[in-house]
């Protein structure tokens, strides 16, 4: 007897991935704490936890892609869930960046006597904002224009053009990451060099980490577009990647103005 479904929602099958992801996260957290406190076996537990967590992420997302692309379970009602989740995730990321910019502004607007009452602290070298930082700043907004091009191509049903646009986006992202690496290689200060080094490298490094995650996200979208997974009505994964990438490229303007330029001169 064939069961009929009188609603537009997807009732997922039982899955082992939530519990395996929880165990991987637990092992990663405990292993990280043990490693930082030089406990024996901490590095091993941390490595195993990360491997287990990454494997769980891969197979869980694989199942989601199978359910949406091959089995057709992601109706319009189901697609609202990932969209709302992506928006809330980006909002939480905004709060994280706000925290780091607040720390930098708090330290630079009222420098304490421990750092000489000046900003940047006396004896701390800073990067010239008009060299690599200025060169790197317009690259991410340019990649944002490329990902918008890809979005319009998907909506127009032009698959090859969407692939070309995603390739352009990824290439610009890789160039940006390369420039970020050059910045850190040439940086005259480290994360342990006073509050300036801590806030500078934490804020810019956190943003650089988001660029890497967004690049991986877009690479997967590019592969899926090449395989014909994304259509006019079913491209929620790409939309989430595009929203995330626009967030990343806009955020780049804030550290340049507040940390590289104003906070470093």
UniProtKB/Swiss-Prot annotation:
Biological role stated in the UniProt entry: Component of the cytochrome c oxidase, the last enzyme in the mitochondrial electron transport chain which drives oxidative phosphorylation. The respiratory chain contains 3 multisubunit complexes succinate dehydrogenase (complex II, CII), ubiquinol-cytochrome c oxidoreductase (cytochrome b-c1 complex, complex III, CIII) and cytochrome c oxidase (complex IV, CIV), that cooperate to transfer electrons derived from NADH and succinate to molecular oxygen, creating an electrochemical gradient over the inner membrane that drives transmembrane transport and the ATP synthase.
GO cellular component: mitochondrial inner membrane; mitochondrion
Keywords associated with the record: Membrane, Mitochondrion, Mitochondrion inner membrane, Translocase, Transmembrane, Transmembrane helix
Coiled-coil features, chain-numbered ranges: none
Catalysed conversion reaction: 4 Fe(II)-[cytochrome c] + O2 + 8 H(+)(in) = 4 Fe(III)-[cytochrome c] + 2 H2O + 4 H(+)(out)
SUPFAM superfamilies registered for this protein in UniProt: Cytochrome c oxidase subunit III-like
Origin: domain of life: Eukaryota
Statement: the UniProt record of this protein carries the keyword Transmembrane: yes
Topology with respect to the bilayer: Multi-pass membrane protein
Gene source species: Zea mays (Maize)
Entry-linked CDD domains: Cyt_c_Oxidase_III
Protein name: Cytochrome c oxidase subunit 3
Top EC class, one word: translocase
A Pfam family of this chain: COX3
PROSITE patterns for the chain: COX3 (PS50253)
């Amino acid at each position: 007897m064939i069961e009929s479904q009188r609603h537009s929602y997807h009732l997922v099958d039982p899955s082992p991935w939530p519990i395996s992801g929880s165990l991987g996260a637990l092992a990663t957290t405990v292993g990280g704490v043990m490693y930082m406190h030089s406990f024996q076996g901490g590095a091993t537990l941390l490595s195993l936890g990360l491997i287990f967590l990454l494997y769980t992420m891969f197979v869980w997302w694989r199942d989601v892609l199978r359910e949406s692309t091959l089995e057709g379970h992601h109706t319009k009602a189901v697609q609202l869930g990932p969209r709302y989740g992506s928006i809330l995730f980006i909002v939480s990321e905004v709060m994280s960046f706000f925290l780091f910019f607040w720390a930098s502004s708090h330290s630079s607007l009222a420098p304490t006597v421990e750092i000489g009452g000046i900003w940047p602290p006396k004896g701390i070298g800073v990067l010239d904002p008009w060299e690599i930082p200025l060169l790197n700043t317009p690259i991410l907004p340019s990649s944002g224009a490329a990902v918008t091009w890809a979005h319009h191509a998907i909506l127009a049903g032009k698959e090859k053009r969407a692939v070309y646009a995603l390739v352009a986006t990824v290439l610009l992202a890789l160039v940006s990451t390369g420039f970020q690496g050059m910045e850190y290689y040439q940086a005259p200060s480290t994360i342990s060099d006073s509050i300036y080094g801590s806030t500078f490298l934490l804020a810019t490094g956190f943003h650089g980490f988001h660029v890497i995650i967004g690049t991986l996200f877009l690479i997967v979208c590019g592969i899926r577009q090449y395989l014909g997974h994304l259509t006019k009505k079913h491209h929620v994964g790409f939309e989430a990647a595009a929203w995330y990438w626009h967030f990343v490229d806009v955020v780049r303007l804030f550290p340049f103005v507040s940390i590289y330029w104003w906070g470093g001169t």
